[in-house]
Design a protein with these regions (language model features):
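Context-dependent free N-terminus signature
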Residues: 2-3
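Cleavable N-terminal signal peptides of Sec/SRP-targeted secreted and luminal proteins
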Residues: 6-25
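Von Willebrand factor type D
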Residues: 90-327
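Low-complexity, Pro/Ser/Thr-rich intrinsically disordered segments
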Residues: 26-53, 323
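Intrinsically disordered, low-complexity eukaryotic regions enriched in glycine, serine
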Residues: 44-46, 58-59, 184-185, 191-192
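Secreted, short cysteine-rich peptides and small extracellular cysteine-rich domains stabilized by multiple disulfide
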Residues: 46-91
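Intrinsically disordered, low-complexity segments used for protein-protein interactions
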Residues: 10-16, 31, 35-38, 42-43, ...
């Protein structure tokens, strides 16, 4: 049964960050930056500070050292000439910084730890299915893995879309580590901000670069709007959280923002269930960050499999519905 119109009309944004040190990106265009500001990426140099000279030199000040907040160590905004820094999420609604979490459609945050080297169904509906592949690191002092999302496998109609982060030893933000395929064929996009790829098989689907490397926006008209960015675990992240990152693997993973249109009231999955009109949050909301269990219900046999216990994909002829909405 379809969700009531009042619910369908309100497009919910789900921000996804999994069980390590991810901050999620907004699934909506960024508004213009404030005047006299610069975005810096000190994380690529393995530290949170960066020396810069602001464009406005009338005050004849010496170059200042800008320090990104620990909520956003790899990217932040510097206001000139004060050299004060802010996380981008302080300016852009819908973005999230800080502790790893899912943010459900009901507005509540929760962890889903999952397990490394396994796939889990994040959203499963009649005409849309999204799995996430987890990578991880085991800390001997803990009973679970540190986990991150390395890739998404998206099924709609008879198509398969793969969005992934390539395994990377030494991180270089100027090298593109995105891996994108549609129905098994590579998606190649010119390395310029705003460059766009459009599917010939599904013209309503576009992939647009949001940065010259490692960031894209994937849109399927009337179905979803996804922002992804490949990021590493930095030495600082590893030191603070005891991730024990080694030189042979920077644990490159995805920061993800989801925006969905027209999910039905039968939707399920780790996140999908929070969109149901009858969803009841049974997590311990008094905890600093509730943890969703029930891993067995969400395990998929591979990145594109629709065999998790709560799968809804293809039910009630829904596979053809997405094509109609996208045209």
């Amino acid at each position: 049964m379809a969700r009531p119109a009042s619910c369908l009309g309100a497009v919910a944004i789900v921000l996804v960050v999994l069980c390590a040190a991810m901050s999620s990106a907004a699934a909506q265009p960024r508004r213009p930056l404030p005047p006299n500001s610069r975005v810096i990426h000190p994380g690529r140099f393995g530290k949170r500070t960066q020396t810069l000279t602001c464009d406005n030199t009338k005050d004849k000040r010496n170059p200042c050292v800008a320090t990104c907040d620990k909520r956003c160590p790899n990217e932040c905004l510097v206001l000139c000439p004060s050299c004060k820094t802010y996380c981008l999420c302080d300016f852009y609604p819908g973005m999230s910084c800080g502790d790893p979490r899912f943010t459900g459609a009901d507005g509540n945050n929760f962890y889903f730890h999952g397990k490394k080297d396994q796939d889990f169904c994040v959203v499963s509906d009649a005409d849309l299915h999204i799995n996430a592949h987890f990578i991880g690191k085991r800390n001997p002092s803990m009973s679970r893995d540190f986990t991150w999302i390395q890739a998404l496998g998206i099924r709609f109609a008879d198509h398969r879309l793969y969005l992934g982060a390539q395994k990377t030893s030494k991180w270089d933000n100027d090298v593109d580590r995105l891996e994108l395929t549609f129905d098994g064929a590579p998606i190649d996009i010119v390395a310029d901000i705003g460059s766009q790829w459009q599917s010939t098989a599904m013209p309503a689907m576009t992939v647009t670069r949001t940065s010259m490397t490692n960031g894209v926006r994937v849109e399927l008209k009337g179905v979803f709007d996804i922002m992804i960015k490949v990021v590493p675990i930095t030495e600082e992240d590893s030191r603070i959280h005891n991730y024990d990152v080694t030189e042979d693997d920077s644990l490159a993973h995805l920061d993800i923002g989801f925006k969905f249109y027209g999910l039905t009231d039968d939707v399920h999955g780790i996140l999908g269930q929070t969109y149901r009109s009858n969803y009841v949050n049974k997590l311990n909301v008094s905890a600093s960050m509730p943890v969703m269990g029930g891993i067995a219900s969400y395990v998929s046999s591979n990145i594109f499999a629709t065999d998790c216990k709560v799968a809804r994909f293809g039910h009630n002829g829904g596979i053809s519905m997405v094509t109609a909405r996208a045209n």
